[in-house]
A protein has these predicted regions:
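Mixed-charge interfacial surface used for oligomerization/domain docking
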Residues: 3-4, 12-33, 75, 85, ...
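Short beta-strand/turn micro-motifs composed of small residues
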Residues: 9, 90, 238
């Protein structure tokens, strides 16, 4: 039997801690800067991000996992087991330094060849879904080599599709992560752009008008039409202060559309700094062939 492959991801993946523990996923902290304080993502509630903005008028900024964050974890793993194998399924490399930090962390290390890095080209729950799917693949393929696992992960990441709709555009504008920020108009007009994660970038696509609960059903159908989502599992993204009408609408519509398993995942502090309160999102697996 091949040596067990250990999965590593950043806390920005929003993988719930109990799920990470169950699947054996090690989470590396990303960071949130509020004033002169730098806090580890996952150590405080995302509602604090919103409270800070309400109190100061400033949106907290984020930073990726550092070389030290990765190296300290990698060193600890290989001290316990020099033959360990690690597959780092990284937060989108075009949005943060985490992937590069991981590369530098293994540079000149004797265990370098026992670590593989895959850019998931996803953030938040998109990354969560991809990492969870890779964990399931590894369970079904216990004798897979590290290279085989990395190839499988790349395919899974390509099939994974994510979008979200922010309620308040101020966070997304301030965060500077949206690649076509000029498309971010509409707060006063009740226009809400759908942000899709495309090749690792946050891209503002179709705009929806009206209240979040009303447009949730329409977005689900549009997203399914575009990606031909597989029916075995769909993820919905819940953020601080999201309207419960959104949850009801998506649960009801997903059931009618034949989705067998519905999982709600709450965003952590990193993506809350960019998407803000009241947002919601959808993550699914495309049944279309991916280039």
């Amino acid at each position: 039997m091949a040596n067990e492959i250990i999965l590593v991801a950043e806390t920005g993946s929003d993988i719930p801690k109990d799920l990470a523990q169950k699947l054996g996923i090690i989470l590396i902290p990303m960071h949130v800067l509020m004033g002169d304080q730098t806090l580890d993502d996952g150590t405080f509630p995302p509602e604090d991000v919103c409270a800070y903005y309400d109190r100061t008028g400033k949106i907290p900024t984020t930073s990726g996992s550092t070389i030290y964050d990765f190296r300290s974890v990698y060193d600890q793993i290989f001290e316990k087991n020099p033959d360990a194998q690690i597959l780092h399924l990284a937060y989108s490399a075009v949005t943060t330094c985490s992937y590069h930090s991981s590369e530098l962390a293994i540079e000149n290390k004797v265990y370098k060849n026992n670590v593989r890095l895959v850019d998931t080209k996803h953030v938040s729950v998109g990354q969560c879904a991809a990492v969870s799917a890779v964990a399931a693949w590894l369970k079904d393929n216990p004798n897979a080599t590290l290279d085989e696992a990395a190839l499988a992960a790349e395919k899974i990441c390509k099939q994974t599709q994510m979008c979200f709709v922010p309620k308040n555009l101020d966070y997304l504008r301030a965060g500077g992560r949206c690649s076509n920020a000029t498309a971010l108009v509409g707060n006063l007009l009740q226009l809400h752009p759908c942000i899709e994660i495309i090749d690792g970038k946050l891209i503002a696509c179709k705009k929806y008008r009206g209240h979040m609960g009303k447009l949730a059903r329409t977005l689900l159908h549009d997203f399914d039409s575009k990606h031909a989502l597989q029916r075995d599992h769909i993820y919905f993204i819940v953020t601080p202060y999201m309207d419960e009408a959104v949850r009801t609408a998506l649960n009801d519509e997903a059931a009618l559309m034949g989705f067998q398993k519905i999982t709600w995942v709450k965003t952590g502090c990193v993506i809350t700094c960019h998407g803000g309160p009241g947002a919601f999102g959808i993550v699914g697996t495309s049944s279309k062939e991916q280039a």
